[in-house]
């Protein structure tokens, strides 16, 4: 077995070695970027201003599904629809006495908003329907 004398013998190539080589790599990269900036004369200033807030969307995006159950998810027609300001998204729950729940989701225009948030009996005996809307207050 060989033993090394002097400072080389006390170095242990481990995590510190990796850290120092990574730090050296970052230093070289920084020097190269500064030199390129000086040679080519292009300097990209850093924008320290706070970013402007995103504009309020003009449309409300609603989930649309023609037949959905909690157990199986959407079975028919899964996509999204856009509805203009003043309109809403609606989910119609159709339930029976055994707590089975079938849902229909869609967009609702201003004229159809009377359907929102009320319960009614279904034309089919033993079932009832509950509609639930969500809307967003749009800025004009």
From Swiss-Prot:
InterPro entries: LY6_UPA_recep-like, LY6G5C
GO cellular component, one term: extracellular region
Alphabetized UniProt keyword annotations: Disulfide bond, Glycoprotein, Secreted, Signal
Localization (cell): Secreted
Residues listed as glycosylation sites in the UniProt record: 96
CDD domains: TFP_LU_ECD_Ly6G5c (cd23545)
Keyword Repeat listed: no
Disulphide-bridged cysteine pairs: 62-89, 65-74, 81-107, 116-133
Residue ranges occupied by any UPAR/Ly6 domain in the UniProt entry: 60-140
Signal peptide from the UniProt entry: 1-41
Quaternary data: Forms oligomers.
UniProt function note: May have a role in hematopoietic cell differentiation.
Official protein name in the record: Lymphocyte antigen 6 complex locus protein G5c
